[in-house]
């Protein structure tokens, strides 16, 4: 198993399959990626994951951009599944109604679907497109095939902070888990007008959940708390993702990232931590060479939010 200098095991690999997306969400961080021209093939992704699995990485999440716009998405899933115990996908849901059954057959274990609002006008304002109805259909289809389905809601001040309870009800109706996510930016953007305008702190809401929940669990990943809250006769599972200045969140991160153009990346918010793995692979690197590249990347890992930065 890979363990960094801070004693944190690395068990998860988050792979961006593309920087492209069929929506244009105004807050999107693009998985912390910069522009690049390289493009990983299914064979190259498979080899990297095969090597990662030898190092104890058994959970892989496919992201983007929007990963399902890759025409070879089913091939990628089929290639990766033999090497991992948990293969998941984060998607905007626009293709889910059409692809859900094929994704399941290819070997996908579970899905996270982005859904920031249930209001058509707001959805178009946030994403630039009027496709909310298709996404809702896709969510309902996904919940019949996958468990759990998680709905990712980035909570933004003055945009959708008035919809949290409605989203909880919807999650209960479709038997999904709701993830409430704080808007996240790097340190240099904390004083930006964008952050001041849209950041909505989730700590007060989490304190309210503590009182309302019939049960509370804590995940190993980031020590995120999961609240089981009664609403309209159902128990809805709500997970709060609160990363800004959260030292506990960082100290319990078990992720490594692979960018769409083939760089290992140790942290979403860092841009000084890229380690090229695709270049050496294309230049004939052996599996032993690729293992050393993984080890080098893990040595670079350090918590973004610390007691000195919080």
Swiss-Prot record:
Species whose genome carries this gene: Pyrococcus horikoshii (strain ATCC 700860 / DSM 12428 / JCM 9974 / NBRC 100139 / OT-3)
Pfam families linked to this entry: Fer4_12 (PF13353), Mob_synth_C (PF06463), Radical_SAM (PF04055)
Pathway: Cofactor biosynthesis; molybdopterin biosynthesis
SMART domains, A to Z: Elp3
Residues given in the record as GTP binding sites: 14, 61, 90, 150, 255-257
E.C. numbers: 4.1.99.22
PROSITE patterns, per database record: MOAA_NIFB_PQQE, RADICAL_SAM
Cofactor detail note: Binds 2 [4Fe-4S] clusters. Binds 1 [4Fe-4S] cluster coordinated with 3 cysteines and an exchangeable S-adenosyl-L-methionine and 1 [4Fe-4S] cluster coordinated with 3 cysteines and the GTP-derived substrate.
Disulfide bonds: none
Keyword Transmembrane: no
Gene (UniProt): moaA
Protein name: Probable GTP 3',8-cyclase
Keyword S-adenosyl-L-methionine: yes
Cofactor dependence: [4Fe-4S] cluster
Residues reported in the UniProt entry to bind [4Fe-4S] cluster 1: 21, 25, 28
Keywords from the named record: 4Fe-4S, GTP-binding, Iron, Iron-sulfur, Lyase, Metal-binding, Molybdenum cofactor biosynthesis, Nucleotide-binding, S-adenosyl-L-methionine
Domain of life: Archaea
NCBIfam families given in the database record: moaA_archaeal (TIGR02668), PRK00164.2-1 (NF001199)
Domain Radical SAM core: 5-232
